[in-house]
From Swiss-Prot:
This is Large ribosomal subunit protein bL35. It comes from Shewanella loihica (strain ATCC BAA-1088 / PV-4). Belongs to the bacterial ribosomal protein bL35 family. The lineage of its organism: Bacteria, Pseudomonadati, Pseudomonadota, Gammaproteobacteria, Alteromonadales. One of its GO terms (molecular function) is structural constituent of ribosome. Transmembrane segments: none annotated.
Length: 64
């Protein structure tokens, strides 16, 4: 049986942890001048993928 392929885009964006998959938050790439310092600071923190999305991520990362 052939090896399962890892989705490389998903591999770069998500990291497997004991509690699920860790991801970076959106809205921190551009148009930052109108966002407050507090909002930008909070967006820097990593967060976990939603429970409903975990099976899809796990399927794309078979060796994670």
């Amino acid at each position: 049986m052939p090896k399962m392929k890892t989705d490389k885009g998903v591999q770069k964006r998500f990291k497997k942890t004991a509690n699920g998959f860790k991801r970076k938050q959106a809205h921190l790439r551009h148009i930052l001048t109108k966002k407050s310092t507090k909002r930008k600071r909070h967006l820097r923190a990593k967060c976990l993928v939603a429970k409903s999305d975990v099976p899809a991520i796990a399927r794309q990362l078979p060796y994670a």
